Amino acid sequence: MRFFFLLLPVLLASMVSFAQENPYFVTYDHHMEEPGNLDLEVSATTDVPRAGQKYYFAPWMEFEYGVTARWTTELYIEGQTTYGDSTVFTGWRLENRFRPMKREHWINPVLYLEYENLNEASRIQKEIVGGGSDVTSPNSELRNTSAHELETKLILSSDFHDWNVAENFIVEKNLSKGEGFEFGYAAGFYHQLATLASGEKCRLCRENFLAGVEFYGGLGSTLNFSGRNTGNYVAPVVSWLVSDNATLRFSPGFGLTHESSPVLFRFGYSYEIQGIGSSLSQLFGRKR
Amino acid sequence: MRRRSTFVACSLLVALVTMLGQNPEYRQDPKWSAPDDAARKVNPLATRPGATAGGKKLFLRNCAECHGNGSGIEKKHSADFLLPVVQDQSDGTIFWKITNGNTDRGMPSFSKLPEMERWQLVLYLRTLKPVPSPR
């Protein structure tokens, strides 16, 4: 086992991959993680609070692994710090995405299933359903209310003339208490700034940038189905292939309703490691 | 005489390394074939050889992980681009295979790359020299 930990940094350094992540923070498209690759990502959500609310910073970490070319699984760990209040661990999520169709089509569906073990202090707002997060109550109160939730999404995504267009329909059920089924949506589009790769190795070339816009928000629940009294945002998104193995993403989200924060800022850094699945299985004796 | 035998030994070694570096066991998936209209597509960059360098960069980013870096060393089940069974396919067929992938065999779709970048990949693949299959 000691041998494994000694070898791990060498293994990681030698397996750098070069794939660029899409720029969305909330919307999913139909592109899955490549089989055997592990994508490590650190991201955060913060906002400009309304009067009477407190500034918060909510980081999360993702471990995204391509099990097969049509199945991606992902583990999230998240927390948050509220200025003048406290720092708390807010829980974890395990998601799976399945792509039922083998080939590319005009519209490509993906089925999404996630289990969430969170408390009510969660602020990352990876998706917004129902009426959105409670950003007014103190952490000491919110962290004691745990929520076991099951979330499903229907992801529809198309690549059309070098544009990606994606729509997500979200249904979430809190298994811990009777809130009915909560609904939400996300949609977006993006484009690579240059569509022909230059022969030179460059970092600030347009080909290394993806830019677009996403829209997301809650749609109420079965108890109160409505777009009113929910958070809704429009958010420009941009990603930059900052080095051969890493992507930086940034998105300012602008609230469209009174229940939304005036501005949400999201940023993320992802680092992809290729072939980690097969390398680890070889390390433990499986033949290639 | 000695120089000649050294030359022959070196040539045999190079041939052996090339053959061993290839993936002669690679067999096309018979179910993985491009529709006729896709197979007939012509590479719009065929008259722009300057785009090949960008294709090489994209190849190293996206393909070399499984298919090797063009020297014929790759994962067991991945296509070896040096083999005639790959090089004999039309540009349109290779473009279609890059776009759609073969998800049952672990080849992901690369439709996330802009169309011109996928044609750049085809352009670069054509510069790889095919080696006859060992009988």
Task: Label the model's feature ranges.
Chain A
Residues 19-288:
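Transmembrane beta-barrel domains of Gram-negative outer membranes and organellar outer membranes
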Residues 5-14:
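Bacterial N-terminal signal peptides
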